[in-house]
Amino acid sequence: MSWEIVIGLEVHVQLNTASKLFSGSKLSTGAEPNTQASLVDLGLPGTLPVVNREAVRKAALFGLAIDADICRHSVFERKNYFYPDLPKGYQTTQLAEPIVGAGTVEIQLDNGEKKSIRIHHAHLEEDAGKSLHEDFHGMTGIDLNRAGTPLIEIVSEPDMANAEEAVAFARKLHAIVTSIGICDGDMSQGNMRFDVNISVRKPGEPLGTRTETKNLNSFRFMEKAIALEVERQIDVLEDGGEIVQETRLYNGDTHTARSMRSKEDANDYRYFPCPDLLPVAITDADIEELKAAMPELPDSRKARFTNDYQLSEYDADLLSGSIATAAFFEAAAKSGGDAKLAANWVMGELAAKLNAEEKSITDSPVSAEQLGQLIARLKDGTISSKIAKQVFEACWAGEGNPDEIIEAKGLKQMSDTGELEKIVDDIIANNAAQADDYRNSDDAKKKKKIGFFVGQAMKATQGKANPQQLNKLLQEKLQ
C-alpha cells in the first residue's frame, strides 16, 4: 500500500551577535549558569527592551540571500505560555508581520535532481532559557543565560517528500547562514535546531494530521527521526488508528521518540503586539546597503567552482556547501596547482580521516598548504599515488611537511630507468611460466594478467616505481 510523505521544517538559527536581542547581555558559550542574564532578560518590572540593530540586519540579510520579500514595517508580538525556562511568561516573537516574507531555496539530491523548497517566512524571536536535569537529584535547574538570545525561525512550506529532501534542505540552509556570516553553524552548541513536521496520506487525498518532532540538532538525527515517525504513522493508520496532533521528542541514543504534549495552534498562544517595542522600519537605503555587503552565496560559489576549476556539478556542490571546506579546497588547489586532484583529496582521504576522528576541517592536522605540497609532488611525479597516501598519514601524525617526510623516508619514485629495467628483467626471469602464459593470451586477458607483474615490481621497489614507466617497460619486455 503506497503512502505519500509530507514534510515541512521549522529551523531555529542562532544569530552570532555580540549581545542579546533586547538587552545588552553578552552571548557567551560555557559561562557559569545565570551569569549572563540581565534584568531585561528576566522581565522584571520597570525594564524595557531595546531591539538589537545587528540582529535585524542579519535577519534581513538572510531574506535577501533567499530572494525573499523584506517587510519594511516589521512588528514584534508576545507569544504567551508558561514554561519554567521562560521567565517573562511570554516570548517576544513575530507572527503577523515577520521581517522576512516568502522566498525559495534550491536543493540538489544525490541523483543530481534539483528541487525548489518554498520558504513561507522567517521571523526574529528571542530564545528561552535552558532546563538542567543533571546533578539536581530529582529536581530541575534553570539556566537563563540563553534567555533573550536572538534567533531567526525559518518556516518552510510542506514541500519535502522524504528524509533525503529534508536533510538536503537543512544542509543548504546551514550553508547559506554560515556563508553570509550570520550564524556560526555549530550544531553541537545548538546554533541550529530543527523542528520537523510530518504527515502521511494516500495519493490524491487531503493532507493528513501532522506531528512535530522538536529540537533535532544534527542531520543524521533528523534523517533517523523522520524515518521513525513515518514508520510509526503508517503503522497506526494501517491498523485503523488515528494520528494525534502532537509534539514529539526524539532520543538519538536509543533511536526512540516519545510524546511531549499535544500540538498547539497559534490561537492557543494569544498573540498580541508587544506594547514595549515600536515597529522595525527598514528603508530602501538599508536594503541596498545589505545587497552591496552580501558575501558569496553557496550557489554562486558552486557555479564558480564548475567554471573556474572545471569540477563536476556533484563535486562543486559538495565542496561549496561549507565555507570552511570551500576555503580549504581553494587554498590546496592554489598551492598544489591541480584543482581536480585537490578536490579528490579533500573529498576522499581528508574527509575520511576527519570523519573517523570526528574533527571539523578547521581542526585538520594537515593544513591546506601541506595538502597542496603533497598534490604538487604527486603531480610532478616525485611520488606515486600509493606513496602519497603514506605521506599523508605521516603528515597527519605531525611528522612534518610532505617534502620533509618524502626526503627523510626516501619515498621518491625511482627515476633511474636502468635500475627499474633490471628489476623487471629479474621478475620476468623468476616467473617464466606466468610470462609465457601472458604472451599466449589475447589482448583482453593480457590487461588483467599484467597486474601480477606490476604487483611484483611494486613489491620489489617498495611502491616507489613509477606506474606509467613500469607498465611501459613490462609491455615491451613481455612481447
Swiss-Prot record:
Alphabetized UniProt keyword annotations: ATP-binding, Ligase, Nucleotide-binding, Protein biosynthesis
Enzyme class, first EC level, given as a word: ligase
Domain of life assignment: Bacteria
EC number per UniProt: 6.3.5.-
InterPro entries xref list: Asn/Gln-tRNA_amidoTrfase_suB/E (IPR017959), Asn/Gln-tRNA_Trfase_suB/E_cat (IPR006075), Asn/Gln_amidotransferase (IPR018027), Asn/Gln_tRNA_amidoTrase-B-like (IPR003789), GatB (IPR004413), GatB_C_1 (IPR042114), GatB_Yqey_C_2 (IPR023168), Gln-tRNA_amidoTrfase_suB_CS (IPR017958)
Pfam families for the chain: GatB_N, GatB_Yqey
Reaction catalysed by this enzyme: L-glutamyl-tRNA(Gln) + L-glutamine + ATP + H2O = L-glutaminyl-tRNA(Gln) + L-glutamate + ADP + phosphate + H(+); L-aspartyl-tRNA(Asn) + L-glutamine + ATP + H2O = L-asparaginyl-tRNA(Asn) + L-glutamate + ADP + phosphate + 2 H(+)
Gene Ontology terms: biological process: glutaminyl-tRNAGln biosynthesis via transamidation; translation
An example molecular function term from Gene Ontology annotations: glutaminyl-tRNA synthase (glutamine-hydrolyzing) activity
Assembly and oligomerization: Heterotrimer of A, B and C subunits.
Family: Belongs to the GatB/GatE family. GatB subfamily.
Function: Allows the formation of correctly charged Asn-tRNA(Asn) or Gln-tRNA(Gln) through the transamidation of misacylated Asp-tRNA(Asn) or Glu-tRNA(Gln) in organisms which lack either or both of asparaginyl-tRNA or glutaminyl-tRNA synthetases. The reaction takes place in the presence of glutamine and ATP through an activated phospho-Asp-tRNA(Asn) or phospho-Glu-tRNA(Gln).
NCBIfam families: gatB, PRK05477.1-2, PRK05477.1-4, PRK05477.1-5
Protein's recorded name: Aspartyl/glutamyl-tRNA(Asn/Gln) amidotransferase subunit B
Organism in which the protein naturally occurs: Alcanivorax borkumensis (strain ATCC 700651 / DSM 11573 / NCIMB 13689 / SK2)
